[in-house]
A protein has these predicted regions:
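Conserved alpha-helical "signature site"
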Residues: 1-118
Length: 118
């Protein structure tokens, strides 16, 4: 789960870098990593986030699936699960090409492997 969280965070960061101001990319990374916090801690996500001070847009994406980061999270999950319909719909909504998303996904996977020293 930890590896998936790191890949998810990095992918969100790279996708956000295509469309959002640079200062928002760190928040996109946090959304990606924290989106699996409930699974990592085996508690509901809302409870896991109670003791963490996060910007409202991060919380909105994580708990409500709304806000600026929500489509990036949805696209990232579609990449992981192979949900082609959601992938196509959200990539189109974000005006990202398949090439951009696939390149970012490969970069995220490679980055996570480098962290593990593989």
């Amino acid at each position: 789960v930890g590896q998936t969280a790191v890949v998810r965070g990095r992918l969100m960061e790279l996708l956000a870098a295509e469309l959002l101001p640079p200062e928002e990319c760190d928040n996109a990374f946090v959304v990606g990593v924290f989106s699996l916090l409930d699974t990592m801690l085996n508690v509901p996500l809302e409870k896991a986030l109670e003791s963490v001070a996060l910007p409202q847009p991060v919380t909105d994406a994580l708990l409500h699936g709304t806000g600026v980061f929500a489509p990036f999270l949805e696209l990232t999950k579609a990449c992981e699960s192979g949900d082609d319909a959601t992938f196509a719909r959200v990539a189109d909504e974000l005006h990202l090409s398949n090439r951009q998303v696939n390149w970012a996904h490969l970069q995220a996977l490679a980055w996570a492997e480098d962290l593990n020293g593989d």
